[in-house]
Amino acid sequence: MDPGDPAGDPAAGERHRMGRDPLLLLQALQTLWSTRERKQLREEAWRGFAALDDPLAGLLDMLESCRGQRGEGPSLAAWISHQLQCWLQAQPCPSLAQHSLRLKQLQARAVKVLTESPPSLAAPLASIFQLQDADRSCLLAHVHRLHHEGRFREAATLGATLKLQSELGVEKMSIPLLLQDKVALVERYVAGFPDLQRRLLVLMDSWCQPGFDIKDVARRYPEVTSLSLEKLSPKALSRQVLRLQERYGVAPALCPNAAIQQRLAALRHLCHKRFVEKSLSQENWTDHVQGLVGQSPWLQEQLSQLLVSHSDPVTAAQCAMELLLPEERLPAAVAVELRRFRLQGRATEADSRLEVKDMKDRYYQLPIPRENVHLLASWEDLTRHEGALLQCHQVVGVDVEWTPVFVAGGRPRPSLLQVAVEGHVFLLDVLALSQPPTGQGAQAFSRLVAQLLSDPSITKLGYGMVGDLQKLGTSCPALAHVEKQILGGMDLLLVHRQMRVASVPAPAVDRARELRGLSLLVQQVLGTALDKTQQLSNWDRRPLCEEQVIYAAADAYCLLEVHQALCREPARFHLSEDLAGSRRPRHRERPGARKPPGLQKASAPAAPRQVPVAVAVSEGAAPQIPARAFRVVCDNMLQGLARSLRCLGVDARMLGNGEDHRRAAEVARQEGRIILTSGQPFHKLRAQVGAGRCLSVDCSLKAQQQAKAVLKHFNVRVTHADIFSRCQACNCDQYLKVSRDMMKQLMWLSSHQEGPRSSGDEATQSQAVQEPGPAPDAAPEGCTYDRPCRWLQMADLRAETPDMLADGTRLQLAGVPVGVLRTPGLRCFYCCTGCGKVFWDGSHLGRVATHFRDMLESAPSPCEPSPAPSPASSPF
């Protein structure tokens, strides 16, 4: 007898007879649903579907029977609908004919079920019953009702599922979602509808216009006015508009207000660079500002206000005169100074040459004669100097300059490639050499660069070299992906990171002019910083001015001098002794990570979603950092990572849900922490704190995997003693030991003084080495947690509230199950003095040690069989 034949199995036959009745099938599935046996449940469901005379009508019978049964978590009704959808797709039989009478009858029933069911049923019902072709009037009425009830998310989701967007429109459905910061849902709503996408952009762009107040819109939706509207400020919203504009391929003319806001943001940035950081020359500042402001009256007014806020009236008037700003758009004090300058015939210059000379004395100076800086703009120039550029066994510094782009859609293109060798600097004019793309100059340039980068005997020095070289492909197609051909490269960005992590003291500078990047590295190694005032200049202008030539040469030549200094005294900078011989560093790449061969470290990941992989600076081991000396601040998207790092003893601060990512930069600067972030803020944060002080973490990894990646990246040493040396909740590293008898007494006093406590909020907040629960696991034999901390004394507690420390911290005793007090071998508890959490020895310690065993330093493990330590004396 075939065991697979229902006729040979009485129980199976009974199931088939039962399955012909949809309600009996539902009853059987409800019984299995409570057991959570998903495999058995699926098999029973599919057998039942096959036995139903009409599976579609049977589904509706079951759903109608389930109406009104709402609960938390996944519903059985939604699961059955999804399973029938899968079952139908696996059947060879055709579905009901479109527009047939039978299908219309089923659609009418399905629409009625849908209007009385949770949103999770929408997708499977729409697929099974082809609801996109059903009577849309009932569906539209239901969506409008959801919207009227303030269930905006459900209305938009259902409308998109049923393809009702054309009838529903975009303004009505998207405005309340935008007010609730549900941009992703709005994007899904308009996906596949180009006309709606354009209307959405027009709507969002209208909110970016000068003088617009988003609160006027929010007042029409009282259900969402309590939410924060910061993300809908013109500055933030314009970023979203420009992102969607590029994604949808919409012409920039459709979003003029967002472009204006972007130009205003660029003006703020340039004013900060010029007047606060003083890292931009007046000439370059004027050049960029004129291009941004143009003839826009509103931008002229905004620029006038920026000038007044960043400088005095005299300086503001000088700038206004150079920029030809209309006098009527200037504040009164600035207008007075401007009229005075015009009477004099020119703006007074306060001995700027003397100031420039003083500035030059403070910065790194090019140590070679000016005649040793060569500008190569033709294939003949390249041929003449090819021997010097490609000389074997030499060290060269490589850098690229490009004109910054301040408007959306622009792509920076390289203008100049600098190659420094001992005693000389060669400035390769990329603009001249790359035109025409198939010309003799372009071919000679591409061939020379490829030879230089692929020769392993030539050590190429750079600072973020990969990011620089990637731009060469935009001007020279033959050099696309040239960064992957690098052999014998050394990126000083990684070396700088190791120096910073090893606590090489940064120079004491004015906070506003705080050094970063290569300028800071030059300051730390050579004693004077690199002058970056020409960095944002117009590198496409020809001929280059003398200041640009000197800056470009110094930018590349300083790499040679930094490398020489590091090789002479590596110990001074906490680097490996064999740094001088490190031309082909050994790689320690994480599986799946892509890096160009022969390069020590990429400047930044192509997309800031993945943790850059640490690579040794030399054949020797990179400097290690003890876990307890490693200090980080995590943004609010990485709170799980912060808790995992605390679990291993790392001092990890985390931002609250309401704190902006700019707060991370403030904390990092004030407390000397490294920023761990994810997503778009990475590049902005890295620019604020400097190279090596900000890391982008892959959000697709679990928290413990993220922790491993971060610790490996910074070469952090973790020992068994570090595990749980910090409180995972508050980051405090101070504990008090509490004996078991004392804990019994405290729990008894607390319960009798305040009455029985609920194990709700406090219980869920209290977390321990052994997770709180009614029946805790015992710790593995010999696996103990013994913190060197003092024992809790009665004098440490307040007399009137025995569960509160003298400083006001309340011990979270409600999180300790009574059963834990009876655990054999449990000697004591640990109380965090920062937040009052209670911890105790349990199986969680062993699990953490096992999970991170490849990270733990070889040392005696508390999880190896050994006599459990006990206190020399007990005060109780």
Swiss-Prot record:
Its EC number is 3.1.-.-. Keywords: Exonuclease, Hydrolase, Magnesium, Metal-binding, Nuclease. Signal peptide: none annotated. It is an enzyme of class 3 (hydrolase). Possesses 3'-5' exoribonuclease activity. Required for 3'-end trimming of AGO1-bound miRNAs. SUPFAM superfamilies: Ribonuclease H-like. The keyword Ubl conjugation does not apply. Pfam families: DNA_pol_A_exo1 (PF01612), Mut7-C (PF01927). Belongs to the mut-7 family. It comes from the Eukaryota. Residues 517-571 form the 3'-5' exonuclease domain. CDD domains: mut-7_like_exo (cd06146). It comes from Homo sapiens (Human). Its cofactor is Mg(2+). This is Exonuclease mut-7 homolog. One of its GO terms (molecular function) is nucleic acid binding. GO terms for biological process: nucleobase-containing compound metabolic process. The keyword Acetylation does not apply. Residues 578-607, 751-781 are annotated as: Disordered.
